């Protein structure tokens, strides 16, 4: 059932036809309202007519009309109509919140123009609203008018009495509805005038204590007092829309062509354009933030666990467990002692293999954050490319024979200033306490023959970049000792003919990257160019297929690793590379692509140089988001759901604003003269004839069957004419007056009501009616008016 596609949230309103419920679509996540209409007592023809009309209305596309998504008839006898949700509520409630404080004229005319444009669109489509009132005019959160409940009451209003089902209380009913005339588009203009009067005065244009008095006031033709705090043009426009004779009321099209309205449309148009351009700027800025949001989310939700795994006599390696981690640029990394080798002696190679499998899906991901440009100026001297090593502090040069305790002391000294680029590898404190011994991390692959693996030597210090803030910690995989020995042997052979490098500069806190042969390497950077322009940028670098094959041959993969590897390749490879690196960054990688593993240290340096020398275009960010793994997306979903929803809604509102701007521009271009259609409908003889274009016009009163065109036979013949309701009202009123006064006294009262002198008339009425004057004088006057002006 279509109803199952929505998640019900709460009831937002109830009416005479049913209730309105706020729902959320399970698939697209958008909010809608479902209006449930009770059709249990309606005939099958009436139900079909209501549903067909709802489907017709769902095709209307206008920025000032509530969108209709779908409708269906449930098995419970209810008609369900799904409409767009307006966060600002209805206009009636908005006016009540004013608490007597009048709105500025610009706001009144702004809403007035939007309602008028919606009515003009409906009238051009030959659709009458028939139930225009402030309760059916809604506001979005950007203060845009949405006219709703279009034509739904046409079928339903014929059941029950007029006071409860016609339009609730008929504050907006035009005088012709109480006579032998059908509903016409000029009745919509009357209702529009009532709405504008209510917006200007915060009161109903016609009000009374009871239904009979209200009908009498409307038919009497006595205009309410016009608002004095507004311009005479607005007051005159309201007065013409509330003219008793329909032919004297202007059409909606002519209203929008008046100079007074055009002037306000121009002002509103300029304000809307400015708001739209401002929203566009915000949307452009928000597009540069999703990657940074992912980084900050991971910083809050994830933790690193670093284990020191004892090696064989040939050396030791670093093993890292956990998910991909990204650390914020603002927060320093807490550096604590590592677990001592003695605490991990019980770990076996099999366990290491399992741990490797657990992190295999993300072992190829490198995350790098680049410091904004304002901090580069003071650190440009420290930015060193791989081909140009420069000076480093003597404290950063590590003696090959230094002890573990010396390294620990130097590490603790650097911890005190986490903002300095000399920080070493970041580590979380473990349960072992501060008293446990710790060692610096050494890389899996030495970069030249001068630096040989030694258990007491730290070789994990990479190129120093003073401009780089403490950055994200890339993920390194678990490796078996046998695998490490194989890799070190390969590295010794590889580095035998490579260039020598006597020094290594220290890198801000981050872990060494793993062998980048499996899948993709994501580089997330926050940097600014020399022109102080920049934002979160990101790139995805695919490793070559050859190096991927070489990595698979290094060691046998477990079943879990193979599953993760296959899943990672299926997810990553189709997206393709999103960034083209500069030639300077590609050239150092060429020797390693020929069936040789890439040194982690050199690869990291190449990535750093690439990011420093190459500014990624902003339009590449969208492609980056497709390259993120499921692990990254799942870890950041909760933090980005709302922003994505806001962005989606913001885009929808921006489109609506653009449509509104285009519509107002077209409205300003309307000609000043009446069209042929307007001239034809102003003919009094055809004013209330059931026009052939108005297929959904409701015949409220009279015998017009011979005038109905053939295509109007769609209207249900079982509909009770509106005159039947009025006739019942008059009958009830007549019975009440006759019972209270009697026929003879009622005839005398009718004669006295024809007296021209008001004072003499009232005196004689009091004399004849006595104590009944207060109760029956007004009722007798209403009964006389109905019998003289309303024909049945």
From Swiss-Prot:
Binding site for ATP: 12-20, 35
Active site: 131
Tissue: Expressed ubiquitously among various organs and is up-regulated in the testis.
Transmembrane segments annotated in the record for this chain: none
Subcellular location: Cytoplasm; Cell projection, Cilium
Modified residues (N6-methyllysine): 566
Enzyme's top EC category: transferase
GO cellular component: cilium; cytoplasm
Modified residues (Phosphoserine): 340, 343, 675
Role of this protein: Required for normal entry into proliferative arrest after a limited number of cell divisions, also called replicative senescence. Required for normal cell cycle arrest in response to double-stranded DNA damage. Protein kinase that seems to act exclusively upon threonine residues.
Protein name: Serine/threonine-protein kinase Nek4
Species whose genome carries this gene: Mus musculus
């Amino acid at each position: 059932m279509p109803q199952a596609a929505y998640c019900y949230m709460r009831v937002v309103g109830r009416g005479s036809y049913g209730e309105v419920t706020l729902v959320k679509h399970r698939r697209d996540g958008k909010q809608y309202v479902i209006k449930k209409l009770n059709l249990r007592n309606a005939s099958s023809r009436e139900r079909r007519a209501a549903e067909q009309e709802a489907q017709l209305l769902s095709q209307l596309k206008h920025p000032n009309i509530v969108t209709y998504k779908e409708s269906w008839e449930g098995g419970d006898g209810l008609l369900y109509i799904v409409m767009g949700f307006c966060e600002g509520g209805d206009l009636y409630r908005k006016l009540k919140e004013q608490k007597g404080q009048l709105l500025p004229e610009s706001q009144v005319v702004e809403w007035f123009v939007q309602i008028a444009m919606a009515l003009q669109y409906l009238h051009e489509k030959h659709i009458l609203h028939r139930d225009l009132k402030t309760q059916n005019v809604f506001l979005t959160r950007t203060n845009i008018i949405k006219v709703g409940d279009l034509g739904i009451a046409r079928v339903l209003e014929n059941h029950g009495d007029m006071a409860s089902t016609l339009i609730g209380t008929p504050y907006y009913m035009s005088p012709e509805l109480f006579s032998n005339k059908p509903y016409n588009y000029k009745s919509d203009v009357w209702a529009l005038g009532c709405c504008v009067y209510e917006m200007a005065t915060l009161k109903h244009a016609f009000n009374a204590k009871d239904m009979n008095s209200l009908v009498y006031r409307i038919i009497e033709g006595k205009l309410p007092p016009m608002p004095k705090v507004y311009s005479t043009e607005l007051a005159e426009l309201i007065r013409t829309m509330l003219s008793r004779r329909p032919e004297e009321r202007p059409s909606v099209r002519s209203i929008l062509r008046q100079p007074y309205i055009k002037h306000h449309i121009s002002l509103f148009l300029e304000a809307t354009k400015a708001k739209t351009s401002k929203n566009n700027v915000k949307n452009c800025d928000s597009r540069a933030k999703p990657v940074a949001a992912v980084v900050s989310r991971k910083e809050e939700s994830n933790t690193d666990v670093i284990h020191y795994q004892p090696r064989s006599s040939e050396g030791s390696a670093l093993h890292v467990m956990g998910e991909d981690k990204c650390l914020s640029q603002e927060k320093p990394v807490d550096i604590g002692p590592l677990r001592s080798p003695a605490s991990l002696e019980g770990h076996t190679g099999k366990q290491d293999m399992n741990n490797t499998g657990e992190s295999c899906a993300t072992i190829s991901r490198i995350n790098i954050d680049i410091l904004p440009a304002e901090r580069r100026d003071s650190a440009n001297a420290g930015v060193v490319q791989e081909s140009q090593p420069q000076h480093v502090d003597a404290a950063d040069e590590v003696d090959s024979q230094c002890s573990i305790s010396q390294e620990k002391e130097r590490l603790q000294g650097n911890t005190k200033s986490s903002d300095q680029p000399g920080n070493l590898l970041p580590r979380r404190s473990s349960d072992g306490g501060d008293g446990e011994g710790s060692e610096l991390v050494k890389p899996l692959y030495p970069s030249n023959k001068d630096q040989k693996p030694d258990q007491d030597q730290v070789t994990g210090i990479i190129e120093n970049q003073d401009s780089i803030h403490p950055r994200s910690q890339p993920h390194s995989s678990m490796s078996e000792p046998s695998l490490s020995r194989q890799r070190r042997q390969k590295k010794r052979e590889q580095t035998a003919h490579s260039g020598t490098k006597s020094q290594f500069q220290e890198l801000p806190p981050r872990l060494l990257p793993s062998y980048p042969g499996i899948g993709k390497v994501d580089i997330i950077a926050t940097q600014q160019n020399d022109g102080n322009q920049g934002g979160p940028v990101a790139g995805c670098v695919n490793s070559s297929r050859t190096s991927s094959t070489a990595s698979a041959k290094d060691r046998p993969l477990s079943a879990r690793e193979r599953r993760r590897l296959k899943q990672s390749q299926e997810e990553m490879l189709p997206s393709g590379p999103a960034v083209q690196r500069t030639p300077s960054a590609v050239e150092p990688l060429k020797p390693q692509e020929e069936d040789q593993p890439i040194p982690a240290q050199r690869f990291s340096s190449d990535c750093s140089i690439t990011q420093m020398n190459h500014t990624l275009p902003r339009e590449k960010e969208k492609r980056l988001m497709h390259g993120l793994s499921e692990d990254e997306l799942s870890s950041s979903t909760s933090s980005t759901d709302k922003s994505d929803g806001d962005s989606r809604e913001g885009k929808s509102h921006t489109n609506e604003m653009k449509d509104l701007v285009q519509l107002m521009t077209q409205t300003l271009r309307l000609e000043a003269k009446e069209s042929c259609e307007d001239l034809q409908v102003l003919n009094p003889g055809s004013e209330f004839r059931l026009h052939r274009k108005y297929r959904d016009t409701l015949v409220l009163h009279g015998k017009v069957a011979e005038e109905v065109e053939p295509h109007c036979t769609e209207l249900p013949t079982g509909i009770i004419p509106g005159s039947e309701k009025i006739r019942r009202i008059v009958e009830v009123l007549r019975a009440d007056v006759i019972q209270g006064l009697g026929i003879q006294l009622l005839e005398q009262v009718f004669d006295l009501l024809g007296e021209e002198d008001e004072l003499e008339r009232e005196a004689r009425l009091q004399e004849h009616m006595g104590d009944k004057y207060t109760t029956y004088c007004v009722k007798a006057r209403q009964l006389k008016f109905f019998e003289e002006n309303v024909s049945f």
